[in-house]
Amino acid sequence: MTSTHLPATLLLLGSGELGKEVAIAAQRLGCRVVAVDRYANAPAMQVADTAVVIPMTDAEALKQVIREHQPALVIPEIEALAVDALAELEAEGITVIPTARATAITMNRDRIRDLAAGELGLRTARFGYASSAEELSSAAEPLGWPVVVKPVMSSSGKGQSVATNPEELQQAWTAATQGARGSASLVIVEEFLRFEQEITLLTVRQKDGPTLFCPPIGHIQERGDYQCSWQPAELQQSQLLEAQRMARQVTDALGGAGIFGVEFFIASGEVIFSELSPRPHDTGLVTLRGQNLSEFELHLRAVLGLPIPSITSTGAAASRVVLAGADQQGGPVHYRGVAEALAVPESELLLFGKPEARPMRRMGVALASGSSLAEARGRADTAAQAVALEIGG
């Protein structure tokens, strides 16, 4: 087995709540963590050995900080990055997780969709692309109504909307272009799937060893952003095997080591590929409660070349996010109801430590276990609903 010599220096590009859990898992293995993001006091910076603030889309700033710290591994945790700089650094011998190419492909919905549907032939929703409002109208018409319109470059549901008729396409075009990351004006338009489930299949590619899969995670999204998740999701065996086949195929095409969050729809009993993130997934926060090894521990073991003897479910588990209110903005942030949340049996609460609130921003998550998925989900919901934010003071 090819493993990274420990202790190693790991550099996180992105320091949000998922990066924070990666940093904690890394430090438990004796690693030194450098947390980089565009704003100070980001969640992972609060536990890292070193914190650096730079414009994340500035290629020169990104190259400078990586060359300065000479990490054993560069671990991207967000999508808004100067990916061309990562390719240049990789050519210099810096290891990017999973690879610079995979990072570049998956930050663009058109590139990952072209790979999955075009090159690999995976089943996806019917879709088209448009670079103007006029092209959007032409691309949407054959798909039927409603349609989903998204920027090809965005995250957390930014710029995503549903158009129920041709008259709403101009508004959808405006929302997509305004919500896009950078100056990209290309949008993807998809048929609206009436699905039974949305699932995440966390897929682990090892340096040496077979691809492994976590128990499937069910989740619900609103405004294109994760609201709750539960594990294990209830799938037919044939559906699980098909999801695993598709996940293995697309992650093999991307290459590299680490955990991949592969999202699927289950619609009319069929498994349909949706999206992919080459890193721990927000819906996978539930693995802190539902598995013997969390997605963050698995990611670290995979990228460091350490063994993963097994991935097993520890029972029914669920998560529910704690959101800022629709009118809450700024900081400092204070929390009420924490004691009430922690009084819920078999529950825990993670408050991410984000320095400022924004409307509907994810500020924490409640996790819970139970004798059934219904009990676990009910407990997570109760704990999350007990928490309220106060701004200022």
UniProtKB/Swiss-Prot annotation:
Highest taxon above the source species: Bacteria
Entry keyword annotation includes Kinase: no
InterPro entries: ATP-grasp (IPR011761), ATP-grasp_carboxylate-amine (IPR003135), ATP_grasp_subdomain_1 (IPR013815), PreATP-grasp_dom_sf (IPR016185), PurT (IPR005862), PurT/PurK_preATP-grasp (IPR054350), PurT_C (IPR048740), Rudment_hybrid_motif (IPR011054)
Catalysed reaction equations from the record: N(1)-(5-phospho-beta-D-ribosyl)glycinamide + formate + ATP = N(2)-formyl-N(1)-(5-phospho-beta-D-ribosyl)glycinamide + ADP + phosphate + H(+)
UniProt record, GO biological process: 'de novo' IMP biosynthetic process
Binding-site positions, Mg(2+): E263, E275
Protein family according to the UniProt entry: Belongs to the PurK/PurT family.
Record's protein name: Formate-dependent phosphoribosylglycinamide formyltransferase
The species this protein was found in: Synechococcus sp. (strain RCC307)
